[in-house]
Amino acid sequence: VAAIAAGLLVLPLTAAWGKTFVDPEVDAAVQVTRDTGAARGHATPALAVHPDDPQTLVIAESDAYSARCMVHVSRNGGLTWSPATQPATPPDWQGCGFAVTGAMADLEFAADGTLYYAWSAVQATTTQQRIYLAKSTDLGLTWDVSALPRIGPDPAKRVYGADTMPSLVVDREDPNRIYVAWWSNNGIWNQPVAVTGSDASVWCRLTDNRALARPWVSTSTDGGRTWGDPVDMAPGVGHCTTEPYLTQAKDGRLLAFFGESTRSLEDGKSPPAHLFFSETADHGKTFTVKPIYEQDGNPATPTSNSDWLGDAAPGVDLKTGNIYVAWEHMGAGTPNVLFMRSTDNGKTWSPPLKVNDGDGKRDWDFPETFPSLSVAPNGRVDVAWYDYRNDAGLKEGDRRATFQDVYYASSTDGGRTFAKNVRVNDRAIDRRFGPKLGSINGPVGIASTDKAVFVAWDDTRNGNSVTTSQDIYFTRVRYAPPAEVFGGDKDTGTSPWAAGALGAAIALALGGLVLVTGMQASRSEPTPTTPTPATPSTKEPSIT
């Protein structure tokens, strides 16, 4: 490979490198997390791209084994990654993430490049959780931290201080207005009797509406320094909801999507679960909500006392105003990634469209595909998810799959149709070990530009049944040559010519997956320093 690369470096680049690819090319996977501990459990990456420099990427993730949240930064389009510093929290809230079926953290850039990062901290002594937000103007070298209001704990009111799975939006019209949504009453089945006041399950039973899990949002109008009281985004919804996901409409309205967890009245089958669309026109003060999809029953479990719909992944085309949402269907048949669109600001919705063009080899009744959705500036709709279609280890009668892949599909006609699915990971993910066995799993990370889609996922390739290690991996799905993806239209410190030539050389050498990880960027990456831990000054109200 080196010889071919060296030979090609002296040749002029041809006009072929100026083309726009019809079919995308997938680059080799890059390991993001670099700690060498024998037992590590990095999981549920969230991904964002800088608004002015598509080579600058950030990933938020958490180590499920050490209960640490982390942020990683790349300044060269994801070729290499460096850890940012972790924002300081009070001594009794040092942990991160707990009992999740969604993302443990979220992050987003404001238009001016300010980075906002929300995560769920956990208290080791009680397993209670709360949401923090951090703000950085230097890509994670330093942070300003604030604590969001809590829902409880107040067992008498059936709220237990278990706030998790944040979703973050920075208002495009006013970058000082920050919205953070989260899910309450998560994981309380693992809390001690001293916290719940009961030695029986208190979660989401319809019998007495006890311990309802709800989608909350809090708004800051001063860039995240202080926060308003939380608002329930599901007024009138009597069942437990699943975790909320936020996006912002073209006209500035805040939009939220979440599903439903229904449990029976202790006998018979539960009611069907719905996908909900909630919106606010007054910056998060009040919400109107309506169901936009009803999940059909699963005949494989005709006596099930639980129905679940979650993992709603929304996006908006800022040119047309189209609103999109993808989610995992867990009703009749094998699970699918479904997609709907609205062209009239959410008033009406298209029939659901199946995105995956291959099916898993078994039924299940709990989230496992975790789709994520992103919309490129040019309107291309990108969806990525975990997929079991190639599971060679599945045996008849298994209720748990073994080998998982990451797949991607795109739409260039506003979500009317999707292109053939593309596998983006370069080796199967063995799910016989790792945090997923403890239900620590969540969405694929995704972010889009016109020229590339960036995808991150958790991967066990460096682990085994003894260490059970899991890392975060990353790749690019390119719609343009490497020179354009890594160079762009302005000088960002990396030679576009070198990137393109090396990409061409290795592509020709291997005749398949394009490997670009050998390129050494001329831009130097910042080396974060670890500040002395401090207890930040935070606002810590409790809403009970």
List the model feature ranges, each with a label:
Residues 17-526:
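Extracellular, repeat-based ectodomains that mediate carbohydrate processing or recognition
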Residues 522-544:
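Cytoplasmic C-terminal tails of single-pass
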Residues 2-12:
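Bacterial N-terminal signal peptides
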